[in-house]
């Protein structure tokens, strides 16, 4: 039974913290609970083991002291007898103290005290092992051991009697530990390589420093008093849970798994509180540990990680799980709305804002401003959503229109060097250039096709090739044909930039410029009866490279008389002819039965009419100017009212003022309003000038 309690003691000691104070207190508690004979046996075994384990010098010094003490004891028998009598008195006094303490500390679970005692056979076996072990020691050690064994032999009978009189569980535990120590000591003679590891065994936790002399092992009355004070401080151990079960199936091993590994290892062992992670890291072929989040998330999720399992739907796998809103952005979760859905949302928001404006106007008798709308959080949200949806609608329409068109390469910046950019961009540009060269014709081929088209058009309309032989209508037709031809060229090759392109296209551009200037010069008509018409010289002809320019001489002023009538007749004739040619020009301008497509319209006739009106104002009298001024003011009020209504509606819908890009639906009205304002300023200047002239005269 003593051998069975020993593993329990070792396992309990494994679970205790290994602090020096606890070790010392545990040692005191064990010593205080044993009998005097057990203490003598403990001192004998400890001295034998220490002499083998510790250094030779210190053990040699101790053995020399012990040999001297043994010699002195053998020489004087009388002194030995007196010392033995004093020791027996001390032991009897100490046994009474221990008996009193055992009555307080013996647990109730130890009902059968006979199981916890050492019998005489075990004592004899212990004596034989001790004598055999000590017999192998050196001469100075043998002298000390023989003296101690003689004391043990003399007190053997007293040992058995004291065990029968005062048995304790701690005594049994101490005896079993000593038996294990002696067996370990016998193994040390065979395996000398495990000396350092056996020092760390839990059965040898109670040991003293080798430098301490052996005299400290002997008990004194002061030490007994000290031990009793320590016993009162150590908490009582409840061993009822361990001793309720009287029999065990298998003995508990003295070493734990981590202790056995540390005994065989060369490195320092880890503490018993080390976590599983350290042991996992020390094992090379171990599987990786699972994170704590795995157990919190649920072990059933491990079956969802296998994508090959049929019962598991795809949306339940972790990699298909939707990200939380805190990790993702709002832009990622936005749904793509179609243009029809965006239009419906815009209309609903506009209705909400309009209802708010009507309610606000009924309450406060004026239309809400932008600050009034911003003060209301709900209306402000509507306004922001409206602007956002409008932007999305615009982008969606632009995206749809871009999908219909072929992709265009981004044009290179002229400020960057040609070496700037990646090789991929250069390769793409080279490929695009090769494709363009293969598709589009050369500049010379395009010019030849344009000239051939112009010749066919002239032949159809019976129009001469020389501009001097053309009438006004033919010049207008030539101008439109040239304009469309040049636009067709620029749509293919762009405006001529290089010197070669300019040289090739120069005759066609010069012809178009000359025709345009002739038409603009013919549109300026002198006014009948105007005194300044006599002094106005015609516009200069365009300067053409390689040709001599001929200029008209200034017309001298004529005196008043019959010559005025001669000037008026050609003026009437010119006016009628110009009006007729202008009408023909407009008719010809609307004719688009040509092979070329023009993206822009020519607005020269409108300029002619504006110039004619302004020149008439200079010749008008003061009453005519005043009447014209009144008409312009009425027209200005009408257009201004129309524009103001448009701006108010825009502000109610969008919550902001009209910007320049928002004036596209009313572009004509804005342009007309600008011209009327300029005309009003001109009329005011003319009237003030006429007033000053009349006053001066």
Swiss-Prot record:
Keywords: Phosphoprotein
Record's keyword annotation contains Phosphoprotein: yes
Compositionally biased spans, kind Basic and acidic residues: 86-103, 170-197, 398-407, 424-433
Biased composition (Low complexity): 58-78
Domain of life: Eukaryota
Modified residues (Phosphoserine): 19, 271, 291, 401
Biased composition (Polar residues): 146-169, 412-422
UniProt-listed InterPro entries: FAM13
Positions of region (Disordered): 1-21, 52-112, 133-229, 307-338, 398-433
Family: Belongs to the FAM13 family.
Protein name, as recorded: Protein FAM13A
Organism (species): Bos taurus
Protein's gene: FAM13A
């Amino acid at each position: 039974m003593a051998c069975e309690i020993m593993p329990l003691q070792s396992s309990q000691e494994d679970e205790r913290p290994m602090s020096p104070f606890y070790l010392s207190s545990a040692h005191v508690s064990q010593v205080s609970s044993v009998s005097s004979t057990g203490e003598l046996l403990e001192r004998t075994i400890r001295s034998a083991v220490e002499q083998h384990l510790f250094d030779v010098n210190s053990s040699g010094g101790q053995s020399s002291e012990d040999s001297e003490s043994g010699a002195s004891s053998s020489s004087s028998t009388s002194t030995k007898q007196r010392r033995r009598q004093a020791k027996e008195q001390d032991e009897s006094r100490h046994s009474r103290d221990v008996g009193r303490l055992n009555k307080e500390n013996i647990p109730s679970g130890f009902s059968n005290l006979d199981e916890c005692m050492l019998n005489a056979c075990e004592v004899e076996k212990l004596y034989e092992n001790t004598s055999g072990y000590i017999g192998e020691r050196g001469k100075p050690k043998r002298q000390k051991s023989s003296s101690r064994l003689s004391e043990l032999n003399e007190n053997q009978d007293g040992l058995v009697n004291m065990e029968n009189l005062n048995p304790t569980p701690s005594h049994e535990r101490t005896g079993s530990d000593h038996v294990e120590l002696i067996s370990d000591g016998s193994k040390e003679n065979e395996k000398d390589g495990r000396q350092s590891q056996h020092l760390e065994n839990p059965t040898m936790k109670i040991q003293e420093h080798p430098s301490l002399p052996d005299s400290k092992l002997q008990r004194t009355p002061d030490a007994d008093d000290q031990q009793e004070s320590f016993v009162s401080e150590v908490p009582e151990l409840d061993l009822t849970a361990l001793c309720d079960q009287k029999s065990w199936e298998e003995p508990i091993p003295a070493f734990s798994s981590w202790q056995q590994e540390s005994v065989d290892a060369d490195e320092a062992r880890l503490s018993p509180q080390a976590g599983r992670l350290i042991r996992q890291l020390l094992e090379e072929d171990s599987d990786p540990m699972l994170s704590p989040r795995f157990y919190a998330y649920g072990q059933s999720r491990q079956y969802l990680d296998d994508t090959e399992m049929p019962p598991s739907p795809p949306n339940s796998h972790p990699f298909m799980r939707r990200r939380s809103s805190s990790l993702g952005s709002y832009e990622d979760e936005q749904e793509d709305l179609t243009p029809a859905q965006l239009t419906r949302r815009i209309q609903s928001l506009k209705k909400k804002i309009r209802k708010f404006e009507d309610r606000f106007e009924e309450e406060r008798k004026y239309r809400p401003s932008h600050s009034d709308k911003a003060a209301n959080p709900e209306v402000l949200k509507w306004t922001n959503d409206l602007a956002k949806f409008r932007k999305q609608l615009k982008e969606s329409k632009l995206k749809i229109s871009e999908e219909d068109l072929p992709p265009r390469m981004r044009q290179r910046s002229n400020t960057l060097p040609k070496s700037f950019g990646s090789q991929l961009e250069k390769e793409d540009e080279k490929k695009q250039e090769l494709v363009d060269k293969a598709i589009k014709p050369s500049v010379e081929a395009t010019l030849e096709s344009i000239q051939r088209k112009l010749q066919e058009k002239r032949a159809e309309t019976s129009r001469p090739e020389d501009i001097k032989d053309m009438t006004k209508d033919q010049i207008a037709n030539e101008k439109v044909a040239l304009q469309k031809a040049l636009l067709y060229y620029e749509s293919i090759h762009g405006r001529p930039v290089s010197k070669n392109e300019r040289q090739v296209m120069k005759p066609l551009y010069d012809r178009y410029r000359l025709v345009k200037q002739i038409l603009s010069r013919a549109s300026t008509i002198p006014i009948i009866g105007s005194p300044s018409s006599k002094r106005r010289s015609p516009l200069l002809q365009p300067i053409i490279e390689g040709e001599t320019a001929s200029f008209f001489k200034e017309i001298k002023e004529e005196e008043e008389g019959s010559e005025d009538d001669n000037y008026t007749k050609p003026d009437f004739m010119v006016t009628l002819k110009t009006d007729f040619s202008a009408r023909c020009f407009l008719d010809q301008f609307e004719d688009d039965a040509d092979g070329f497509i023009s993206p822009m319209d020519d607005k020269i006739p409108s300029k002619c009419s504006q110039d004619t009106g302004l020149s008439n104002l200079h010749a008008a009298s003061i009453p005519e100017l005043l009447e014209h001024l009144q008409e312009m003011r009425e027209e200005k009020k009408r257009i201004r009212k129309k524009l103001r209504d448009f701006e108010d509606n825009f502000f109610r819908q969008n919550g902001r003022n009209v910007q320049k890009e928002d004036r596209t639906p009313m572009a004509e009205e804005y342009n007309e309003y600008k011209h009327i304002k300029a005309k009003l300023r001109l009329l005011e200047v003319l009237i003030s000038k006429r007033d000053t002239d009349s006053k001066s005269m």
